[in-house]
Amino acid sequence: MAGAGPAPGLPGAGGPVVPGPGAGIPGKSGEERLKEMEAEMALFEQEVLGAPVTGIPTAVPAVPTVPTVEAMQVPAAPVIRPIIATNTYQQVQQTLEARAAAAATVVPPMVGGPPFVGPVGFGPGDRSHLDSPEAREAMFLRRAAAGPRPMALRPPHQALVGPPLPGPPGPPMMLPPMARAPGPPLGSMAALRPPLEEPATPRELGLGLGLGLKEKEEAVVAAAAGLEEASAVVAVGAGGAPAGPAVIGPSLPLALAMPLPEPEPLPLPLEVVRGLLPPLRIPELLSLRPRPRPPRPEPPPGLMALEVPEPLSEDKKKGKPEKLKRCIRTAAGSSWEDPSLLEWDADDFRIFCGDLGNEVNDDILARAFSRFPSFLKAKVIRDKRTGKTKGYGFVSFKDPSDYVRAMREMNGKYVGSRPIKLRKSMWKDRNLDVVRKKQKEKKKLGLR
C-alpha cells in the first residue's frame, strides 16, 4: 500500500526520523519497521496498564508528522525474527490484559457484576488516548466479547486442561490490514507475558464454589500451561493461518476468564443425608409425629371419659320408659289406665262430640270438621269387645280460634243421621295427677 503523502517513521535506538516525500512504507527497512512495531506495542502496553502517557500519538501511516519518542524507545534486536502471524496481535493483547489484571490487585477490586467492558487503565478524566486506533479497537473488541461472557462460566472441567475454545469471528478480521497495529515480534511476547507462577488473589480464589485454595492455584497453573502451549503452536505456524485454537479478541484475567467448574458440593449433601439417615431411622422420625397425643389420655380425664358414657346410657335406658307415660284415669272412685290418650297431642284444644249414630266413624267425623285450618284429629270411641260405637267421640284443633268457631258452627249440625252435641272435653280433669292436685287444694281451702 503506497502512501500518497510523506510517511514518517519512528526513530530507533538513537536513529533519526526518516521523512520520505513520496516514499511509502514498503521502502522502509526491516529494522525500522521493527522499531515502529516495538514502540507502538510499548505505547499500547503503557496505555493498557494505566501509566501516564507522554502525549505522543501512535504512528499511523497517514499522519504527516510524529514527534520523537525517547522514553518509549526499545533497543532493536539484531536477530532476524519470523513473520508475524495473523493471530499474534490478539495473543499479545490477551497477555497484556492478564498482566493488567495482575497489576490491578493494588487498586480497589471491582465488585462482582457484569464483565468489565472498557479499557483497563482508563480514567474518567483521561480521554486523550481514546483517539488512537489501538484503544478504539481494544474497546470495540471488549464490547464484542462481552456478550457471550456469561456462557463461559458453564463449560465443565475440560476447559481447565487446554486453552479456551475459540469464540465467534470478531470484527478485527473485517477491518483493513493496516488499520490494526502490527503486533510485536515473538521475542517480545516472552518479555510481556506475565509471570504465571504468581498466586491468585483471594478474591479470584473465592470465585470457585467447591474448590479450596490449593485446588484453585492448580487450576490457574493448568490454564496457564495450556495458554503457553497455544502460543507455541502460533509461533510454529507463523506466516499462515493459526495452527492451533486461539481466542479472538480480548478476554478477562486468567482467574476470571477460566470457566468455573461444576459445583461439586451440591450432590454431597444428598449423599451425606442418605449416609447419615439409614432406612431404620426414617420410621423413627415418622413415629415422632403422633407423640403430642399422649397428653390427652391423662388419668383424671380418662376416668371421667370412662364413667361419663355409662350414666348417659343408663339415663337413656331410663328415659325410654319415661317417654311412655302412663295415663291413669280416675272417676267415680275408680282408677284405670288409658293408653289411647297417648295418641293425641297434649297441647291441643279438644272438643267432645256426643249423640253420634251407629254409622258414624272416624272418617265421617273428620270430614265434617276438616274445613277448619288447624284441624288435627277426629276419633269415635268404640267397644273393644264388640267394636260397636259408644255414641261419642273427640275432635282436636291446634288453633284456639278454630276451636271456638267449631263449637259455635257445628253444635247441633247433622253428622250422619243425627245432630251432634258439642262441649268442652274434660279429659285433663280425670287425670290422676290433676285429681290429686285438686284434692290437695280443696283440703287447703277447708272444703273437705
From Swiss-Prot:
RRM domain location: 349-427
Entry-linked Pfam families: RRM_1 (PF00076)
GO cellular component: cytoplasm; nucleus
GO molecular function: mRNA binding
InterPro entries per record: Nucleotide-bd_a/b_plait_sf, RBD_domain_sf, RBM42_RBP45_47-like, RBM42_RRM, RRM_dom
Main location as per UniProt: nucleus
Keyword check for Nucleus: yes
Disulphide connectivity of cysteines: none
Record's compositionally biased regions (Gly residues): 11-27
Gene3D superfamilies tied to this protein: 3.30.70.330
Region: Necessary for interaction with HNRNPK, residue numbers: 204-448
Region (Disordered): 1-29, 286-324
PTM sites of type Phosphoserine: S132
Keyword Cytoplasm: yes
Record family assignment: Belongs to the RRM RBM42 family.
Subunit-structure text: Interacts with HNRNPK.
Function: Binds (via the RRM domain) to the 3'-untranslated region (UTR) of CDKN1A mRNA.
Protein name as annotated: RNA-binding protein 42
Organism: Bos taurus
